[in-house]
Amino acid sequence: MTIRALVVDDSALIRKVLSDILNEDPKIRVVGTAVNGKDGLEKVIKLRPDVVLLDNVMPVLDGLKTLARIMKEQPTPVVIVSALGERAEEITLTAFEYGAVDVIEKPSGILSQSMPEMAEEICRKVRTAPKANLKNLECMRDSEPLNPEKRETKENRVLKKAAPRNILAIGASTGGPRALEKLICSLPAELPAAVLVVQHMPPGFTASLSKRLDSKSALRVKEAQEGDRVEDGTVLIAPGNYHMEIVRNKVNSLEEETIHLSCGPKELGSRPSVNVLFRSIASVYGSRVISLVLTGMNCDGADGAEEIKKMGGKVIAEARSSCVVYGMPGEIVRRNLADLVLPLDKMAEEIIRIIG
């Protein structure tokens, strides 16, 4: 069945570029375009598209207000089209709280060398969006930033970190930012484990996601950098466009594990790749690994989960009932790799029980 798409952007050039990209895909047809949020909302109601590509910064009615009204008046999967820049990235992350399914980076120019690769990513996300479970995209604006006293306590605790006793590795794609916020904000400050995350997102957005989660979580959260130590109570998120692996080093006759980032080939169309992280931690940490495969498209993570199982680690898949898209966890279940299948709101409790 052909996917009917509506493109909403105040730039005539971007509307044309996106429309041309989407119409090249035989499974997608652009049924309309809109020049601002007000125009877009009217066309969503009139045309009833399967997916909306929505600019996050527009005149008349901005992206967030438009998104909120779409989800209230005519619930439809929405993919945010965002430029880079701290303000745009912050608005995009807020859009996930309002119910956006995914984000794509705004094309910078038709002649860009990366355009074919970007076009494939755009089409892939648009093909996935209509599969989203809109029931699990209801507005979630209930996680408040930590107060200054708690933040100071968290920062002081970071100075005392030791090598991790356990490794919690998380892979997510479509619907992941919301799922990560719910999960990570449910974990205790004194978690006796390091947390490593791969979330499929364009470059730039993972830094904003890390800052946002750090402001709301009792754990320290940061975008991973080359050479970062892997430590208890710290969440490291792979930066967009970089694979994240673990390497073991000797420092003053003591072994420690650190982060290694690389721009190796994409795996299953993704960089960072969940498979790359999972294989790496399986080889370094073996049975101390607890891996979680959350909501997301395609099957990234399944091959890596198989390696984790071989080394004695645990694999937990998110249940269909709480997923936005059941692709990645569904593949884990299909291949009989899951030790447990749990809805998102039960995962933190089970992680704490396993780690003890």
From Swiss-Prot:
Biological processes per GO annotation: chemotaxis
Active site positions: S173, H200, D300
Catalyzed reaction equations: [protein]-L-glutamate 5-O-methyl ester + H2O = L-glutamyl-[protein] + methanol + H(+); L-glutaminyl-[protein] + H2O = L-glutamyl-[protein] + NH4(+)
Annotated SUPFAM superfamilies: CheY-like, Methylesterase CheB, C-terminal domain
Chain positions with 4-aspartylphosphate modification: D55
Keywords assigned by UniProt, alphabetized: Chemotaxis, Cytoplasm, Hydrolase, Phosphoprotein
The keyword Hydrolase belongs to this UniProt entry's keyword annotation: yes
EC number(s) from the headed UniProt entry: 3.1.1.61, 3.5.1.44
Domain Response regulatory: 4-121
GO molecular function: phosphorelay response regulator activity; protein-glutamate methylesterase activity; protein-glutamine glutaminase activity
Entry comment on modification after translation: Phosphorylated by CheA. Phosphorylation of the N-terminal regulatory domain activates the methylesterase activity.
GO CC list: cytoplasm
Stored Pfam families: CheB_methylest, Response_reg
Every CheB-type methylesterase domain range: 161-356
Localization terms from the record: Cytoplasm
Keyword hit for Hydrolase: yes
Family label: Belongs to the CheB family.
Domain notes: Contains a C-terminal catalytic domain, and an N-terminal region which modulates catalytic activity.
Cited function: Involved in chemotaxis. Part of a chemotaxis signal transduction system that modulates chemotaxis in response to various stimuli. Catalyzes the demethylation of specific methylglutamate residues introduced into the chemoreceptors (methyl-accepting chemotaxis proteins or MCP) by CheR. Also mediates the irreversible deamidation of specific glutamine residues to glutamic acid.
Protein name per UniProt: Protein-glutamate methylesterase/protein-glutamine glutaminase 2
Native organism: Methanosarcina acetivorans (strain ATCC 35395 / DSM 2834 / JCM 12185 / C2A)
Gene: cheB2
